[in-house]
């Protein structure tokens, strides 16, 4: 995808590195920022289809009961992991899946503030 207009809040597919940096896997992620600078960098948060038994304060579960599940474009219940982040160029984004509501984006922002201030 050459460029993504107004990416903040969008759910996208992107090659996301494993936490040991051994390889990457195409995964859904949420764009946390608008594109920044001449290289059009965005901050992304990882989404996994695994639902933890004990969600962390940085986890948001998207399932049939979440109001944004349908608009997210996710095919199955998933967990947004706000402590698992990366910065990438928008040119690495393969496809847009959906979008988070303003209410969910506010929830994301509050959880990120708590993560970085505690």
Region spans (language model):
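Conserved functional hotspots at enzyme active or ligand-binding sites that engage polyanionic ligands
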Residues: 1-118
């Amino acid at each position: 995808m050459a460029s993504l207009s107004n990416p903040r809040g969008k759910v996208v597919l992107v090659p996301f590195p494993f936490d040991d940096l051994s390889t990457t896997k195409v995964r859904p992620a949420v764009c946390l920022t608008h594109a920044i600078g001449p290289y059009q960098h965005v901050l992304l948060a990882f989404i996994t289809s695994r639902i933890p038994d004990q969600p962390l304060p940085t986890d948001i579960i998207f399932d049939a009961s979440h109001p944004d599940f349908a608009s997210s474009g996710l095919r199955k219940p998933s967990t947004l992991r706000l402590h698992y982040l990366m910065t990438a160029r928008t040119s690495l984004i393969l496809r847009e899946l959906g979008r988070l509501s303003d209410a969910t984006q506010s929830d994301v922002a509050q959880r990120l503030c708590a993560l970085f201030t505690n």
